[in-house]
């Protein structure tokens, strides 16, 4: 969830990632504090005018530390999400686990009234824009050629409003869980 949100990734991007696609600062000789995520299976990779590989730069130290703890010691060829089955079966498994996590928090899930795995990209991009106020940086983060595509994401999603509409017990559980993050990672 943290990788999808912070990186503005599509669910399909997540399923194709392996450990070697995560460039932790130590992998780069400590020359940077950022985590780089290489997308070898991006949505636009087949277009002639598109880059073969795309990348995302994650600068949030807490998210980078969390991902390092979860995936950093794995073999570089190991899939990050190695559930059995074909791509469609793995996608269903990821969605089911995401839904189970939301249910445990009391957060609505589903297209009709709640959050979906696909919303991590839009929510992350919107949060990034709200934090930076910079359209060009946001466009780079979302990997869009067109400003118009980016505008749809930013105009349609108001993540702070969605959070405010959650039931108070769900918001309280989320804050408690967020407060525990520091026990698991040290940025």
Question: Where are each of the predicted segments found?
Answer:
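Short, charged phosphate-coordinating catalytic segments
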Residues: 3-33, 134-140
């Amino acid at each position: 969830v943290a990788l999808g949100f912070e990186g503005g990734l599509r669910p399909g991007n997540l399923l194709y990632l392996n450990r070697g696609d995560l460039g932790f600062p130590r992998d780069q000789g400590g020359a940077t504090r950022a985590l780089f995520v290489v997308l070898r299976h991006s949505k636009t990779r087949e277009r002639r005018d598109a880059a073969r590989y795309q990348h995302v730069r994650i600068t949030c130290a807490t998210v980078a530390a969390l991902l390092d703890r979860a995936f950093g010691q794995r073999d570089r060829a190991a899939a990050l999400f190695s559930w059995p089955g074909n791509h469609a079966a793995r996608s269903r498994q990821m969605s089911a686990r995401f839904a189970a996590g939301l249910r445990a928090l009391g957060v609505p899930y589903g297209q009709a009234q709640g959050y979906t795995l696909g919303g991590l990209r839009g929510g992350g991009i919107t949060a990034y824009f709200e934090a930076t106020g910079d359209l060009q940086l946001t466009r780079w983060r979302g990997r869009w050629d067109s400003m118009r595509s980016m505008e749809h994401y930013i105009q349609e999603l108001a993540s702070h409003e969605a959070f405010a509409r959650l039931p108070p017990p769900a918001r309280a559980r989320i804050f408690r869980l967020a407060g525990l993050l520091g026990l698991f990672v040290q940025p």
